[in-house]
């Protein structure tokens, strides 16, 4: 079987930091090339990864089986729609689109075209989070915190919730069993409409789930704590694992050989998508799973009149 031909749309920071370093290590696929409207900036990036620099989305799509989209959220609806109509499988950075309605249209188009459309919720593929989900026995509560040292603004609260808090909601509800009912919560917005703090409480079956983010906490800390039947688990910064029970505390650091991109789930997400395309199976974060957390965020925004 011939190797998958892979392309990249949008060659900014996230593509350069998280995706191209993995995609360029092609073994089971071929990295064909990239496209960005800013050809002057795109050319040296493509040259550095020894891939073609395409002048248009159409010409890239015609040479690819699957494309990774890292362009602005505002462009997602148009870019993904075009790629799907060209018959290309698509992986896109979260959120899927600017609105849930646009996302639903893209999911319907992907189903109609018979193509995979996966949203890159990389934390679902972080090894320690996957281990936690597997090992938890009857979790009573799960709490996820993802804070920023000093990142209030410059964007408004809506942008920050869809750009960053979305990760917290998606990961926490996935750990809790996906379908969550919101019980309570609060958004603290400053005088110019920027998010300062968010905390929400959900019920996922028998599990209570809490999400929390402070934009000026003086720390970049990310942690998940799970209180379960027989043990308490703590995962710190996606690289340190602690399990406490009656026998004591077991600490399991991430393997020294494991890259940061693997720890944070980017490597797993990329390989899962490409394997799904090759095997013609549905990616984990496709369909309703691609948009469930965004539905929650949009309800938070409506309830807060944002």
Locate predicted features.
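N-terminal Rossmann-like dinucleotide-binding module
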Residues: 1-49, 137, 274, 306
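Hydrophobic residues in well-ordered beta-strands that form the structural core
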Residues: 15, 55, 92, 117-119, ...
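C-terminal helix-rich "cap/oligomerization" subdomain common to oxidoreductases
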Residues: 46, 59, 66-69, 115, ...
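Beta-loop-alpha module in the N-terminal Rossmann-like domain of NAD(P)-dependent dehydrogenases
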Residues: 49-91, 95-106
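A contiguous active-site-proximal alpha/beta segment in oxidoreductase catalytic domains
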Residues: 97-152
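Mid-domain beta-loop-alpha active-site segment that forms a flexible
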Residues: 120-127, 150-182, 269, 289-290
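C-terminal glycine/acidic-rich active-site capping loop/insertion
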Residues: 122, 225-288, 292, 306
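Contiguous beta-strand/loop segments that form the cofactor/metal-binding neighborhood of enzyme cores
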Residues: 163-240, 267, 271-280
């Amino acid at each position: 079987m011939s190797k998958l031909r892979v392309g990249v749309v949008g060659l900014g920071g996230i593509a350069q930091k998280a995706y191209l370093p993995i995609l360029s290590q092609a073994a089971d696929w071929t990295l064909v090339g990239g496209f960005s409207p800013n050809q002057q900036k795109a050319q040296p990036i493509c040259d550095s990864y020894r891939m073609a620099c395409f002048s248009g989305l159409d010409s890239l799509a015609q040479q690819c089986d699957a494309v990774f989209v890292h362009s602005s959220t505002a462009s997602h609806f148009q870019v993904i729609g075009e790629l799907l109509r060209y018959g290309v499988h698509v992986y896109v950075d979260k959120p899927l689109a600017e609105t849930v309605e646009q996302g639903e249209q893209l999911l319907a188009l992907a189903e109609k075209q018979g193509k995979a459309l996966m949203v890159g919720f990389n934390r679902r593929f972080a090894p320690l989070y996957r281990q936690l989900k597997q090992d938890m026995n009857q979790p009573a509560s799960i709490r996820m915190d993802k804070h920023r040292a000093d990142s209030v603004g410059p964007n408004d609260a809506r942008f920050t919730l869809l750009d960053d808090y979305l990760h917290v909601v998606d990961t926490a509800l996935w750990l809790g069993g996906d379908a969550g009912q919101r019980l309570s919560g609060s958004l603290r917005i400053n005088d110019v409409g920027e998010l300062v703090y968010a905390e929400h409480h959900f019920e996922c079956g028998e599990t209570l789930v809490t999400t929390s983010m402070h934009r000026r906490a003086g720390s970049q800390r990310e942690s998940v704590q799970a209180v379960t039947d027989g043990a308490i688990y703590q995962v710190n910064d996606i690289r340190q694992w602690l399990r406490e029970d009656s026998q004591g505390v077991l600490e399991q650091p991430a393997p020294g050989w494991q890259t940061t991109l693997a720890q944070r789930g980017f490597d797993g997400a990329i390989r899962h998508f490409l394997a799904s395309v090759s095997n013609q199976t549905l990616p984990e974060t496709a369909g309703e799973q691609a948009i469930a957390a965004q539905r929650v965020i949009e309800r938070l925004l409506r309830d807060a009149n944002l």
